[in-house]
Amino acid sequence: MFISYEQTEKEAQLFLKKYHSDFSAPVPIERIVEIDLQISIVPIKGLLARESIDAFLSHDFTELYIDHDHYMGQTNRSRFTLAHEVGHYVLHRAVVAQITSIEQWRRFILGQGTGRAVYEIHADNFAGCLLMPRDQIRAEYEIQKKTVEDRFRAAGLEIPDKSTLLSFMANEIARKFDVSPKAAEIRLSKISP
């Protein structure tokens, strides 16, 4: 099952409209998971080291297991992980409901030649769209683009190419949305003209 980036973004927008209708940043993903979706976040020590999995949902959607150290120590990364799992909840609910073991999760994530690894791409795209809503990220893009270009001009430097410009902008935008600079850069590359 392939879901386009545009469709994934639309699903994230509909989800936000229901659970965070003012679309303000940063999106309160932990509250949405625990209060609105009523999914308990369960940190597990050594999950990543033992199973090579950051997080996974229970098949009945009552618990979201996440690596303890990842959850407690890396806020922007754990926020993305929670949003990623919400992506599975929204986009792949029927498939996730059939997964009853950690081994099945591993096969789901890796694909094992079945083409299911595309689900991970969907969930990553959903997480980026959820945590950095389209209108808000576009507005911030315009602000940061002008700021960075003005800095280069003031220093007497040539305005860099688009890719380099996005890298410069990503740090500030990441802070606003409480995501990693890499997540911000990827999202910017999808929405910038």
Residue ranges: model-predicted function:
Residues 1-193:
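Active-site hotspot residues in diverse enzymes, especially metal/ion-binding acidic/histidine motifs
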